[in-house]
Amino acid sequence: MRRFISLLALCGGLLAAVCTTAPSTVSAREPGQEIIRCGQQTPIKGSPRFFTGTVRIDPLYAANNAMRSSGGSVTFEPGSRSHWHIHPVGQVLIVTAGVGLTQEWGKPIQEIRAGDVVICPAKVKHWHGAAPGSAMTHISICEETEPGKVVEWLEPVTDSQYAGR
């Protein structure tokens, strides 16, 4: 229970940091914090080339010269899911709401819930999405190997695979 509360506090802290931080004074000569205000970035509809069902991606931050990671909040409606994919450097998912499912190729489906953190190592084929009866939102953090390259998309997860058959 303490672990769950700690993880939930971490998730809330990440969202609060992204959405409510005070302004910074960044000059061209001095490195400093960059503040990206909650709601500044336009949500993206998940493409059917990469997702099954209704998925919304809310970009949180992009990789830049000082940092190779990028992050986004991804919301899956019930039954929606990613296609199979791999990350060249790995991925961290922080589930912030709902109930979801994730699976590594050749292994059983795992249920994930708000407060759970999923650490997917580099080059592990997997998928993730909402459970059949619940929406699910997670924060995804990935690292680029080259500009814009954080994922290699593969084939869709079939309905039979999603059902665990």
Tell where the protein language model's regions lie, with residue ranges.
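Generic structural detector for well-ordered beta-strands
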Residues: 59-61, 75, 103, 111, ...
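Short glycine/proline-enriched turns and hinge-like loops at secondary-structure junctions
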Residues: 68, 86-87, 106, 130-132
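A short beta-strand-loop-beta hairpin characteristic of the jelly-roll/cupin
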Residues: 81, 86-114, 124
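A short, N-terminal "cap"/entry segment at the start of jelly-roll beta-barrel domains
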Residues: 24-68, 150-165
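Positively charged n-region of N-terminal signal peptides that target proteins for export
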Residues: 1-4
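Bacterial N-terminal signal peptides
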Residues: 8-22
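Ligand-binding loop in jelly-roll beta-barrel domains
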Residues: 101, 108-109, 113-114, 122-150
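Conserved short histidine dyad/triad with adjacent acidic residue
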Residues: 56-57, 70-87
